[in-house]
Every structure is written in structure tokens, then in C-alpha cells.
């Protein structure tokens, strides 16, 4: 690069005298405006004090204001914000030039109207909620946003639709606490620049279409029936295993079956009934059917065979009995 070109570029980079004058006037304009506004404010304040002095003591009642314990007063003097928040208790204002707004610091509740929401699995549900919030910075809630309360209410509706739209129907029904916590965090982050603190969010009611309710009821009933069948099958399996084990044990002992048979007869005899039906051993019929020499079998009528069997039992157990075609009666 030639030295002449360097000099030309430096001259172009340096502002001209006219440009410096314009910049100086622009920079000095806010200072001059602030100076003029300060003089005007001082004059108005002085005239207000003179008016207060001339109308004393009537003007004292116009200067004294009271703020409740749960309120704070944000004061504007000639349209400018007074940095200090007033309250609670008594504070003084200058009539005609001071205005103030009372800000309630108590927790307010807002019932979010029912919102039609399309869940992530394309199911339309109606959900309503309740939001609890309060003002923690009175000045910011007045200066930072046009209407902090209404803005928070509108934001609660949009946040409810946005967050629930990212969840499935089963998650909405089962994870209400988690969804409420996510909604609280989202609202709190959005309203903090407005001087609003979100204390709590609760999903109050989730309503499903009638067709979806019937489908879910049928699914729940089918699930319960399937569970009951599984439990019954498992019970039968355990009972069968126990019976098989008992049969194996009894088969290994010759007297176990006889003892079990006697216990059963004892239990039946203790019942107050005139008719008792009990199993009849087929071995007795086999012994009775074989009559005569050479072991040749002869067929007897069933009634006579039963009577003969019962007579044999009488001789063994000395128990009086009568037989019928359907069974034995004691």
C-alpha cells in the first residue's frame, strides 16, 4: 500500500468538523432536555408547597395517604417514577403533581377456563386448572407490563395448552403432579420479568369424550377379567401340584389310602343328615361276582350284589346299612 493511499484512508476515517458538531448536538440534547425538565419540575414542586402552605391545614388531609399491610404504593411525580415504594402505613404525597397506584401483594387465584387440548397421541381432552400467583416487585409489575394480572392469566391459558400438547393421554391422566410442576416452572420463568411469582399450579379436571370413556371402561373390564382368569389358573395349577404330590405320597404307603378313607367316613358321619352317599370299592363286587366251583362267574342282579356287599361291610365294621340302586344309605 502506498503512503498516499494510507493518508487518504486516515482522512476518510476521521470525522469532519461538521459531523463532530452534529454528534455533539445529539449528545447534548438529552442533557439539555433533562436540565429543562428538572427546572420545570422544581418550579412545579415549589408552587405546590406554596399552595399547601396557603391552604394549611386543609391541604394536610390531601397529602396524607394510608396503605394497608398487604399493599404497597407506587408513586409517580409529574409522570416520573419515585424510586421508593411506599407502605405499609402512612405516607405523604404532593397534591396535584403526585399520583400513586396501590399494588396488592396477596396471593391471587385464577381458575383457568376449560381448554380443548389435542394430546400427543391425537386425543381431544378438556382440561381446566387453577393458578396461584402474587406480585413480588410492585414497581416492575407497574412499569414493566401493561397489566401484570391479565397478562399472567392469558399466559396461563397458552402455557396449559402448550405443555399438555406434548404429553399423551395416559401421561395426562397419571402424571398430573409432574405436569403441574412443569407448568409452574414455565409460568414462573415467563412472569418473573413482570414482577409476578407463580406459587402453585394444579390441574383440576380432565374430561374425556364419551366414546373414549366407554372404550377405556371396556378395556379396564377386559383387563380385570384377564387378571382374574390368570389368578384362577395359577390357583388351580398350585392345587393340582399339591394333589399330585399327595397322591404320590399316598401311593407309596399301603395304609395311607385306608386311613384317608376312614377319616372321610368319620367326617361324613359327624354331619347331621339322614342320607349319606359314599364311594363303594369295586373290589368287593369283583369278589361277589365269582361264585361256585372252579371260579366260574355268575351274574347276579345289581340289587342282590349291593345287598351282599353291604352285608359284608356289616360283618367287618358292624355298621347297619340299607342299599339302593343309586348308592348306599346309612
Swiss-Prot record:
- TM regions (residue ranges): 42-62
The answer on whether this UniProt entry bears the keyword Disulfide bond reads: no
Q: How does it sit in the membrane?
A: Single-pass membrane protein
Keyword Transcription, does the record have it?
Answer: no
- Report residue spans for region: Disordered: 1-27
Assign the protein's first listed, main location to one coarse class: membrane
Q: Which domain of life is it from?
A: Eukaryota
The protein depicted here goes by the name Stomatin-1
The organism named in the record is Caenorhabditis elegans
Q: Which gene encodes it?
A: sto-1
Amino acid at each position: 500500500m502506498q503512503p498516499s493511499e494510507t493518508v487518504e484512508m486516515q482522512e476518510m476515517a476521521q470525522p469532519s468538523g461538521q459531523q463532530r458538531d452534529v454528534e455533539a448536538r445529539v449528545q447534548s440534547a438529552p442533557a439539555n432536555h433533562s436540565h429543562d425538565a428538572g427546572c420545570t419540575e422544581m418550579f412545579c414542586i415549589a408552587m405546590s408547597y406554596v399552595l399547601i402552605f396557603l391552604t394549611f391545614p386543609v391541604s394536610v388531609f390531601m397529602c396524607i395517604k394510608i396503605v394497608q399491610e398487604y399493599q404497597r404504593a407506587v408513586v409517580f411525580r409529574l409522570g416520573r417514577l419515585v424510586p421508593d415504594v411506599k407502605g405499609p402505613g402512612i405516607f405523604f404525597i404532593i397534591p396535584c403533581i403526585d399520583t400513586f397506584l396501590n399494588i396488592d401483594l396477596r396471593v391471587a387465584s385464577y381458575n383457568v377456563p376449560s381448554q380443548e387440548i389435542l394430546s400427543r397421541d391425537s386425543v381431544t381432552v378438556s382440561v381446566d386448572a387453577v393458578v396461584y400467583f402474587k406480585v413480588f416487585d410492585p414497581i416492575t409489575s407497574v412499569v414493566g407490563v401493561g397489566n401484570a394480572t391479565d397478562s399472567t392469566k392469558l399466559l396461563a391459558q397458552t402455557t396449559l395448552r402448550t405443555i399438555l400438547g406434548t404429553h399423551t393421554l395416559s401421561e395426562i391422566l397419571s402424571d398430573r403432579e409432574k405436569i403441574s410442576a412443569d407448568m409452574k416452572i414455565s409460568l414462573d420463568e415467563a412472569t418473573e420479568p413482570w414482577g409476578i411469582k407463580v406459587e402453585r399450579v394444579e390441574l383440576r379436571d380432565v374430561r374425556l369424550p364419551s366414546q373414549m370413556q366407554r372404550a377405556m371402561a371396556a378395556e379396564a373390564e377386559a383387563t380385570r377379567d384377564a387378571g382374574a382368569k390368570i389368578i384362577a389358573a395359577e390357583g388351580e395349577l398350585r392345587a393340582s401340584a399339591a394333589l399330585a404330590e399327595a397322591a404320590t405320597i399316598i401311593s407309596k404307603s399301603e395304609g395311607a389310602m385306608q386311613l384317608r378313607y376312614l377319616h372321610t367316613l368319620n367326617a361324613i358321619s359327624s354331619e347331621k343328615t339322614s342320607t349319606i352317599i359314599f364311594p363303594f370299592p369295586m373290589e368287593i363286587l369283583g369278589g361277589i361276582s365269582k361264585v361256585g366251583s372252579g371260579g366260574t362267574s355268575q351274574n347276579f342282579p345289581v340289587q342282590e350284589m349291593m345287598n351282599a356287599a353291604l352285608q359284608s361291610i356289616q360283618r367287618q365294621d358292624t355298621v347297619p346299612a340299607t342299599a339302593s340302586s343309586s348308592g348306599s344309605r346309612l
